[in-house]
């Protein structure tokens, strides 16, 4: 029976809200709350810039390890998805709370590594669970938009705390409490087993729009390209001359993610995923470059809107293409490209830490990130040109 007439469609709003909450907690807070917290912890003198960069890389390494671990079939048995998702959500909340102890550097690094594993679990188990209940593109867009909502919520939460002179320790404690409330909401909104739909094989197109390994390289470059800005934007924007803009810039990124997730999936349905991915990567590369104009408030606003509106769109478009490609053997391409993306994310902050300290390191790393995105866009452009030649 077509999914449009399947009873699950009556529950799509509930499922969309559930998916949004999954990534609001798992990614928006679990991963990206660290972005507005980094300048706070640095200003308190708890850690050096280099240490904070390695802590960021540790989180991405944990995410990479979690993506690899949870790609095994043993974790995807229907009876295990719900317990694993709730366990990942509980771990995310507890690990956020653990940051309030302000332990030594090595323990903070370990906490953020484990938080990365938990974030990967929430993304993988949450998205798999949703795909078992609906195939509606609105729900998939809502899932990814949760990242933006979490980013905006987390940044405004930190700003409100700083207004009342709260320490980073108190801010982490409050974030842990907020995570607990989200965990309760997730439990209440969990899709019922009886509404699961029949699994369908991945749709493979006869005309392969690109090789599977080329998509993996492209996505790895995108992971490296975006992560510098996603980690250090509030720190990079301190020279903008507008404290109000500097404070809310990361919120602007988060809010622009939401329409971006819906917009790119709509565009892909109309014009195709590969042309949209090409445009997405080009816009993202330009916006990453524009963040270097940190003394221009207007350019920072434009770059933040464009950056936020594209980087989660990259993920949704790559996942759409990956589901259409043939792969050798039993390779799980969705898991593999996520793995390569994770490697790119680790290398970004690690490179920043190795270059030097402060703004000079950020500028150099940002240029490298923009170059990686331009190369990814070039790969996509070449494949699009080849496809047009073949089909003409």
From Swiss-Prot:
Disulfide bonds: none annotated. Keywords: Cell membrane, Membrane, Transmembrane, Transmembrane helix. It is found in: Cell membrane. Its main location: membrane. One of its GO terms (cellular component) is plasma membrane. InterPro entries: MFS_4, MFS_trans_sf. It comes from the Bacteria. The chain crosses the membrane at residues 13-33, 55-75, 91-111, 113-133, 138-158, 171-191, 209-229, 248-268, 273-293, 298-318, 331-351, 362-382. It is a multi-pass membrane protein. This is Uncharacterized protein YjiJ. It comes from Escherichia coli (strain K12). The lineage of its organism: Bacteria, Pseudomonadati, Pseudomonadota, Gammaproteobacteria, Enterobacterales. The gene is yjiJ.
């Amino acid at each position: 029976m077509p999914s449009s007439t399947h009873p699950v469609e009556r529950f799509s709003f509930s499922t969309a809200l559930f998916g949004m909450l999954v990534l609001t907690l798992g990614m928006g807070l679990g991963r990206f709350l660290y972005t507005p917290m980094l300048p706070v912890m640095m200003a308190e003198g708890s850690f050096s810039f280099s240490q904070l960069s390695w802590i960021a890389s540790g989180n991405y390494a944990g995410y990479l390890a979690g993506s690899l671990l949870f790609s095994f079939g043993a974790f995807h048995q229907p009876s295990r998805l719900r317990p694993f998702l709730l366990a990942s959500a509980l771990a995310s909340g507890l690990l956020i709370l653990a940051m309030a102890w302000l332990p030594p550097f090595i323990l903070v690094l370990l906490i953020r590594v484990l938080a990365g594993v938990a974030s990967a679990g929430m993304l993988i188990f949450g998205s798999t669970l949703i795909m078992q209940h609906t195939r509606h593109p609105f729900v998939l867009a809502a899932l990814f938009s949760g990242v933006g909502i979490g980013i905006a919520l987390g940044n405004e939460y930190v700003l409100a705390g700083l207004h009342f002179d709260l320490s980073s320790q108190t801010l982490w404690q409050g974030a842990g409490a907020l995570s607990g409330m989200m965990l309760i909401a997730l439990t209440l909104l969990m899709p019922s087993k009886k509404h699961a739909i029949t699994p369908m094989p991945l749709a493979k197109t006869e005309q392969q729009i690109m090789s599977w390994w080329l998509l993996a390289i492209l996505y790895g470059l995108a992971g490296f390209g975006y992560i510098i800005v996603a980690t250090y934007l509030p720190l990079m924007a301190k020279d903008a001359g507008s404290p109000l803009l500097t404070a809310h810039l990361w919120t602007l990124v988060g809010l622009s993610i939401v329409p971006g997730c819906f917009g790119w999936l709509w565009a892909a349905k109309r014009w195709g995923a590969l042309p949209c991915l090409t445009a997405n990567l080009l816009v993202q590369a330009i916006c990453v470059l524009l963040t270097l104009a940190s003394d221009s408030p207007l350019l920072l606003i434009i770059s933040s809107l464009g950056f936020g509106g594209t980087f989660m769109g990259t993920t949704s478009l790559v996942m759409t293409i990956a589901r259409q490609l043939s792969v050798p053997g039993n390779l799980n391409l969705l898991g593999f490209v996520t793995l390569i993306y994770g490697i790119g994310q680790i290398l970004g902050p690690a490179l920043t830490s190795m270059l030097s300290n402060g703004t000079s390191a950020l500028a150099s790393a940002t240029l490298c990130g923009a170059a990686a995105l331009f190369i990814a866009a070039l790969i996509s452009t070449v494949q699009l040109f080849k496809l047009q030649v073949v089909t003409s």
